Amino acid sequence: MESNNIIEIIKKLNIRNIAITAQSAKPNQIFFALPGISRHGNDFIDIALANGASLIITDQEPITSYSNVMVVKNIILVMKDVVNYLYPKFPKYLVAVTGTDGKTSVVNYFQQLCMLAAEQAASIGTLGVITTNNHLNKLLNQNKTKPECATTMSYIQTRYVLHQLATNGINFVALEASSHGLDQNRLMDIKFQAAAFTSFSRDHLDYHKTMNKYLDAKLKLFKENVVSDGIAVVNNNINELSIIQSKITDEFGLKLLSVEQQGDIQIIDVQSSLNGQKVHFRYKNSDYKFEVSIIGRVHITNILIALLLAVNVGFDSAKLIPLLSNLKPIKGRMEKIQFGNCYAFVDYALTPNALATMLTELRTLNNKGRLITIFGGSENRDAIARRVQMGIVASKLSDLVIVTDQDSGNEDPAAIRKEILQVAPSAVEIPNRGEAIKYAISIMVDNDMLLIAGKGHETRQVLKGRIINYNDMEQVKLHLKQLNKMSNQ
C-alpha cells in the first residue's frame, strides 16, 4: 500500500530518476534516506532538498518537518518497488563474478568474447561500466567520482545501469560482485543465469573479521542471486574448493562447472613468454589450442572461466573458441611496456596472493636480470596484516624492493611505509610514487624487469585525505622519455 501511494505521487510530480546521493540530487528526482553503517540518510535530507530533490522517502521521522518528506515503515521494500517502476528493464543475459582476485579480468574477457561474437555486451565493476558506446559509457559512469572506488555499485545504481543497458540494446552483461557488495545486499533481488568464483585468499578481514565470514559473503552470490536452474563456474585451484562445491551443489542446488585440473575445461599446457602465451586445453573430450598476447598464467584460467560463462548463457563453444586468440590485455592488469631489453609491468595486485602470483610468473619468464618491485600499502584493507604479508612476499621474490606511497586515505603514509619496512629492511624507501618509478627505471640494465603493483588502471591517488591525479603507466612513459630510454623501445 505504501508503495502504491508513493508511485502515484511520483507520477504526479513527474519524477523520472532516483538520486544516488543527496549531493547529486536534482529536480524531478526522489531521494531515499536509507539507514547506513555509521549515519542515517536523514542527516542528508537538507542537502538533497537544497539540490532540488522533489521527494524524500525515509523510515525515521526527521527532526524538522518537511512538506515533501514521507515516512514509511519498510523503506527497503518501497525502494525496490520504486526502482522496479522507474528502472524496470534488464539485459537478457546476466552473469556475475566473485573472488578475491580475477573478477575484473573475467568480466572484461566475457565482454570481449561477446563482442567478438557480434553481440552487444557490457562489463560492470572496478573499471566502471564498459561498452563500445562512448556516450553511454560517459552517462553511466558520471555518478562515480572515482570509478575504482566501488567494485559493486549500490542497488539503485546497478538497476539504473542495467535499465539503461537494456534500453540501448545490450543483451549480455557481466558484473563484479564484491564481498562488501554481497554482504551489504547491494544486489538484492537481481538474478543471474550464471556466476563464477575465481579465487579465494586473505583479504578484507578489517570488514569481515574472519575467513569463514569472508567466504560466506562470497557464497551469498550463489545462494541468493543465481536462478534455480543456473550455472556456477569455479576455479579448481581454490584451496577451499570442497567447501565451495558442497555449498553450491548440495545446499544451493546449482549445477557446478570448473576450470583447471580435472575440470570441465582442463588446461593441458601453457607455454608462456614475455610476448604472450600458447595454450592447450581440453573441453568435452576435444583438444583445442590458442595464443594470446596476454601475460600471466592466471589470466588463462580467467579467460576459460569467461568462456564457460558465455557458453552457458547461449553461445556456441565452436563459435567462441576460435575467437580466444583475439582477446586483448586489460588495462592495468600485467600491462607491459618494453624499453631495450628491459620490461616494466603495471598490475593491480592488491593482495599478498596476487603479488606472489605475478612475481613468481615474471621470474619464470626471465631469470637473466633483476626483478624490481614497487608497491605500497592502502588504507584500512586488513591494514597491518596485509602490509606485512605483502612486504614479506615482495622481499622473498624480488631482487630489489622499493616501498612507496599508494592510497593512504586518512592514515599517515609514513607510518604505512614503516610497517612494511619492518619486514623488508633491505627495501629502498621513496615516498613519492612517481619518483620511485623514476629511480627504478634509472637503475635498470639489460634483462631487468620492473613490477609496479597496487594501482593498475587507477587514475587517482589518495594521500592524507587529498585526491591527486595519478596513473602508474603514465609515470612510466613520462620517466622513460625524461631518461631517454623510450627511443630503445
Name each region found by the language model:
Residues 53, 168-171, 367-368, 447:
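Short, high-confidence coil segments that cap the C-terminus of an alpha-helix
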